[in-house]
Amino acid sequence: MNFEVFALGTSGMMPLPNRFLTSAMVRRDGDLFLFDCGEGTQISLKMLNLKWKKINTIFISHMHADHVTGLPGILMLSSQVDRDDPLTIYGPPRLKEYIDANRRILDMYINYEIIVKVAHPGILIDNDEFTVSAFPLAHTKPCTGFVMEEKLRPGEFHPELASGLGIPMGPLWGKLQKGFSVTLDDGRVIQP
């Protein structure tokens, strides 16, 4: 399990020849999570050989054009690469209206389900391996920041070392493997 972060676009307000508008991608064990989707996002994805249909979730911070103008193209292209899985998009309250208007005006054919959710402050995704949380940011209009945080994973446990230290097999071994210190009957504190 590992996280890889790709800066797809680092320019603000207007794209530059070598810098597209705001977007970032996190790849985690083959799944892709897109944070903002400015103009040029498709080009960056193609240059980095990141697959559109692997995008599980998109997070949009706010409704300024430099953060959302790439979204219609990503949504249309995902249909052309035979996407089957639903796509969840978190963002501001008017994001669904923006997506629906683009679908209608551009006559977009979408062959998969798009689930649009308002990114209220707090935990948006919580599974066994990571969380994604939203929090308000100070900006010229309502804006949301996102944190993707990996949960603690059990470390490698060495039973022979535990036995050698006199730690009895059982619940104490489990606590050590999960990263917790344990206190033995003789008062010794064993660190993981």
Task: Show the residue positions of the predicted features.
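Metal-dependent phosphodiesterase/nuclease catalytic metal-binding core
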Residues: 120-192
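Alpha-helix N-cap/helix-start and coil->helix boundary motif
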Residues: 42, 65, 95-96, 139-140, ...
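Active-site metal-binding motif and surrounding structural segment of the metallo-beta-lactamase
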Residues: 39-90, 117-120
